[in-house]
Amino acid sequence: MNRYSVRATFSGLLAATLALGVLAAGSAEAAAGKQKAPQVQSRSALVMRADTGEVLYQKNAQQTLPIASITKLMTAMVVLDAKQSLDQTIQITKADVDRLRASSSRLAVGTVLTRRQAFTLALMSSENRAASALLRNYPGGKAAGVAAMNRKAKALGMTHSRFVEATGLSGDNRSTPSDLARMVRAASRYPHIRNFSTMRELTVKVGRYPTLYRNTNPLVRNAAWDIDITKTGYLSEAGRCLVMQTTITGKPVVMVLMNSSGTLTRVGDAGRIRRWLETSAPAQLSASR
């Protein structure tokens, strides 16, 4: 083999090596790209920076779905807007009993609560009778309260949302992840909602006995999470839902998770999203806008 052949062979090998390197790098980048998005199991979801409104992740975010007890955040806002005394007492009556799904409640008819206690039980423990009593005692009654809920939704730009009652027991209370993110951002501006929704537990007297209620979102009891506001929900047709605003790497983030199938799926999704934001997508949170 002459020296020209040796040079040609060497050049060919070098070119082949470089080409393989480029292909390998491209494959690595493609693989990394596939890992950029979190593996969210909920059927619909949205992640948004609460301070800027920037959407960081979405999955079927414009799909209109039943929202179950997420409804109670809107109920809380309109009742608080009415500026009724939180120390005034209200009573659970037969009108607050669930006739639609016959769901159970530990709040017996005749139980007397302060409005503050009713708010806490409705938001923290998703107590349907408490939410019903709050709206029933709204100025003008339930019908006026539902009308206020829909006006509030319209004012917030929730163009694909509809409310028909206070608790979320009706599948006709519907919204999208995009609209619910707007609602969570709005609700976070109410100090009482932030406080009531994130309490770990509350003991109230029902009849002659104290009754302990716990938060339906287990993450509020996890010291690793800094949660500003939260609400869970469940209906057979809505699946398991979770909305919350939390702080991740120093930035406020709204998470909306809808139509999860498993009991712990929505909580697992929240953890996956958080890890993704902390590791794979830090630039999206560190950017100042």
Q: Model features per residue range: what roles?
A:
Residues 30-178, 182-191, 248:
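Active-site-adjacent loops and short helices of periplasmic peptidoglycan-processing enzymes
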Residues 2-14:
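Bacterial N-terminal signal peptides that target proteins for export
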Residues 31-42, 115-116, 140-289:
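Penicillin-recognizing serine hydrolase domain
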Residues 23-30:
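Sec/Tat signal peptide C-region and signal peptidase I cleavage site
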Residues 11-23:
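Bacterial N-terminal signal peptides
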